[in-house]
Design a protein with these regions (language model features):
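Structural signature of transmembrane alpha-helix termini at the membrane-water interface
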Residues: 56, 60, 64, 68, ...
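N-terminal first transmembrane alpha-helix
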Residues: 1-97, 220
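Juxtamembrane membrane-interface segments of multi-pass membrane proteins
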Residues: 134-137, 143-160, 224-247
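Charge-rich cytosolic interhelical loops and cytosolic tails of multi-pass membrane proteins
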Residues: 69-148
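Transmembrane alpha-helical segments and their cytosolic interface motifs
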Residues: 8-23, 137-188, 196-197, 202
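Hydrophobic alpha-helical transmembrane segments
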Residues: 35-52, 182-209
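Hydrophobic core of alpha-helical transmembrane segments in multi-pass integral membrane proteins
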Residues: 21-31, 177-179, 207-211
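Cytosolic/matrix-facing juxtamembrane and C-terminal tails of multi-pass cellular membrane proteins
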Residues: 1-15, 195-196, 212-280
Length: 280
């Protein structure tokens, strides 16, 4: 069920965490401004509301993140797992990429583009590289075996989804800051008044949160994580090549196998004309 998928490692760290960060000022306000000494109906409603809010934010972040992802690929000429396979890209050495192309061509049952073919038709070559990326993604789902790749995927998903909720989070920050300032103004900025210190804490959280969203959450950060994931995805070919290993050299089947010298046997009691037994 989709509900239980929400609690897997990727969903928690790449989808739920961005939602929690985006709603941090609101969560701080609910925690500090509502009494939790006794768990009553208002607390129950607030708790359910928070869970629903986080679910909605996580879904919105994923949708917006994917939309931003498409624009980033367009700006940089394609997915990193495609652009890094190109011969014009030096992120991964050409010798390794030649081995990866040959391996993936065998898995896909398609010929890898030569240097001349790629230079003549980059779009066709990119189509092949896109198929390579799809094959690798489908065959590297073992998060224990490909733990480094899984970590890069989570980092990319986290940054992408957090960027997706950057604008709504900043709007929420502005609203909370305005409300907190108005409340403190009505208290004559008396932090010792009832709820004065709690409102001040919420205000500080909102300001710090806004600074983080403005300075740390950016398209450049998402693209950097995307490149790290794309590089690791291509390098995962090494694991498959290690499993296959180098095939042993086969003897030349066109030449007859050399016969081993027959071992000398004691004379048989049977007639000397009898034919000696053949070797197995």
């Amino acid at each position: 069920m989709e509900v239980f998928k929400f609690f897997d490692a990727y969903s928690i760290r790449a989808r739920l965490f961005p939602a929690i960060i985006a709603a941090a000022p609101a969560l701080a306000a609910l925690t500090l401004l509502i009494s939790w000494k006794t768990f009553g109906l208002s607390n129950l409603i607030s708790s359910i509301g928070v869970l629903v809010l986080l679910w909605a934010i996580a879904d919105f972040a994923r949708t917006r993140g994917r939309a931003i992802e498409g624009t980033l690929y367009a700006e940089h000429g394609g997915m990193p797992s495609i652009t890094m396979f190109r011969r014009s890209d030096s992120t991964i050495d050409s010798g390794s990429k030649d081995r990866y192309r040959a391996f993936l061509a065998g898995k896909l049952g398609a010929a890898a583009p030569t240097a001349e073919e790629e230079a003549a038709d980059q779009a066709a070559a990119d189509s092949f590289y896109g198929q390579c990326g799809n094959w690798l993604r489908q065959n590297t789902r073992d998060t224990k075996k490909f733990s480094l790749l899984f970590g890069e995927n989570i980092a990319y998903g986290f940054r992408r989804n957090l960027l997706g909720v950057k604008v709504p989070a900043l709007v929420l920050n502005v609203l909370i800051v305005v409300i907190c300032v108005l409340l403190l103004w009505r208290m004559s900025w008396n932090f010792n008044a009832s709820m004065g210190s709690e409102v001040a804490v919420v205000l500080i959280v909102a300001v710090a949160h806004a600074a983080y969203m403005l300075l740390a959450v950016s398209r450049a950060a998402v693209w950097d994580a995307s490149k790290a994931y794309g590089r690791e995805l291509i390098l995962s070919c090494e694991s498959f090549l290690a499993q296959v290993g180098t095939p042993a050299a086969k003897p030349d089947e066109t030449k007859p196998a050399a016969k081993r010298p027959a071992a000398k046997k004691p004379a048989s009691k049977r007639s000397k004309a009898a034919k000696p037994p053949e070797e197995p």
